[in-house]
């Protein structure tokens, strides 16, 4: 319990102390923001600060800090450390700079930001990468909720069309089209803050349930410092990839520009971007604590949690909420596992539209231009989603790559932020250090993950268990990170000699 409370205090303190350092390093001023300067009534709309925070939280969170934290809890309370320090020194820094760099560049999408600071080749790579990732996320977050709604209807004894995934998938996709097409203040600005509040209430309810029920005890880090993973999966770098949104997520960089286009003042960035990520870290910490405390531990392994997750992550959420909050928890769980993915899905499609708009220089005040982009984006999503609902397309293999690509995107954004700070003659180490760390994480996982190169490097025991080739992957991952850092330092040294290099950024 004390480990949890200490980490919670560090997260809250990190917002004020380290978040203040990050804000001071960036240096927000009183310049006119894109929302005030452009104000097209569609994507550039001034919103109140509390709505900015809640929408940003819901956009970046969804079920990420719940699913990722529960999976991360398989390693035991050691996951508390990554959630805490990863959020403070990496995730919140990443979210703040991805949002504020966008704000300084007229609300540009992250692919355009990467192009400005990392070069034209990286811009084109990020454009394609971002659109594919966003459409994939949006599609999966349409299929998932549709399936959950069908489960509810079937459990209630309903049959016919309302008990088919295809029916609800079409309804979700129609909603996605509307939310992607219309002004951000019409649906997202009105409803999403309420869902954000529900996400926070659900986390608070789980925390209260854990502390008030004597049968649940949160284990201490110092008593369980080693890995408790039932499958023996290494902490490095699997835990860092698995927790994903609960500590740092590249997907957030695709969402932050949405709110960067709605801020009235640059000084709102600390609360909206850094603060929302810290809040997500707190939510992840609570759910990780739930995973560590509510289930049976056998022989130092989280066998009970593993069994619960084997029934499906949504079922695990339902179980945690019902155990800690009873009937109210069940209602919140249903809202969470259905509404939260939908809210992440539609903003994913909206972000895809904006990435394409920036790519092809199409202003979005015109409804015709929005329609031109919405139709193909949602069309591809519909084809993939309906194909999945009909059993023609399997996302399982594709989705395995999401966690790795997610953290790799975060790595790229942090390197872009480092270049930004170099051009601005600021302390670039504040982003270069987490960029180097995430480079090591991403490369190591790419070598160890069975869906990546691990299928060639790892071996199997007689009973089918994976033996990870850490002797090869660990040193290569570290060396690769050092090489990336060396390339960065060489690049800034070279550019430092160029005349007026500081004018290359805004």
Model-derived features: where do they sit?
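Hydrophobic alpha-helical segments and their helix-loop junctions in multi-pass secondary transporters
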Residues: 138-156, 163-168, 180, 199-226, ...
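Membrane-interface loop-to-helix entry segments
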Residues: 9-27, 129, 145-149, 165-212, ...
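Loop-to-transmembrane helix boundary motifs in multi-pass membrane proteins
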Residues: 123-127, 162-170, 275-284, 292, ...
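Hydrophobic, membrane-embedded alpha-helices of multi-pass small-molecule transporters
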Residues: 48-64, 207-215, 224-287, 332-344
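Extracellular/periplasmic helix-exit of transmembrane alpha-helices
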Residues: 99, 209-221, 274-319, 386-393
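Membrane-interface "cap" regions at the ends of multi-pass membrane proteins
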Residues: 10-66, 268
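Extracellular loop-to-transmembrane helix junctions
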Residues: 1-19, 72-102, 111, 330, ...
